[in-house]
Amino acid sequence: MAITKEDILNAVAEMSVMDVCDLVKMMEDKFGVSAAAATVAVAAGPVAGPAEAAEEKTEFDVVLVDAGSNKIAAIKAVRGATGLGLKEAKDAVEGTPFTVKEAASKEEAEALKKQLEEAGAKVELK
């Protein structure tokens, strides 16, 4: 009777970690391969995935991180962007970080970021 893959898997599952490491080394020597090379190749695939996903992102949150030295200009910019009242905009600017706009398109987020940065504020797109 031949040994099945499942029999081998069950035998490996019952081994200690040290025994499995020894088995891997023996297989590397016997077949002239390296388990590390396979691991690197597998790890390289997922690394490229998130980078591509970040490029494809279509909605951004515009977050005011710091009002900068000219708070009045930052308050005016926040009011113009959000339609908040003077007190609400002042509280938002003083209570950074503050999400100015959620789920904005890339173009809208970039324009809003530029407007806030021209007022002296520090802005992040998330």
Swiss-Prot record:
InterPro entries: Ribosomal_bL12 (IPR000206), Ribosomal_bL12_C (IPR013823), Ribosomal_bL12_C/ClpS-like (IPR014719), Ribosomal_bL12_oligo (IPR008932), Ribosomal_bL12_oligo_N_sf (IPR036235). Keywords: Ribonucleoprotein, Ribosomal protein. One of its GO terms (molecular function) is structural constituent of ribosome. It comes from the Bacteria. GO terms for biological process: translation. SUPFAM superfamilies: ClpS-like, Ribosomal protein L7/12, oligomerisation (N-terminal) domain. GO terms for cellular component: cytosolic large ribosomal subunit. Homodimer. Part of the ribosomal stalk of the 50S ribosomal subunit. Forms a multimeric L10(L12)X complex, where L10 forms an elongated spine to which 2 to 4 L12 dimers bind in a sequential fashion. Binds GTP-bound translation factors. HAMAP family: Ribosomal_bL12. Forms part of the ribosomal stalk which helps the ribosome interact with GTP-bound translation factors. Is thus essential for accurate translation. Belongs to the bacterial ribosomal protein bL12 family. This is Large ribosomal subunit protein bL12. The gene is rplL.
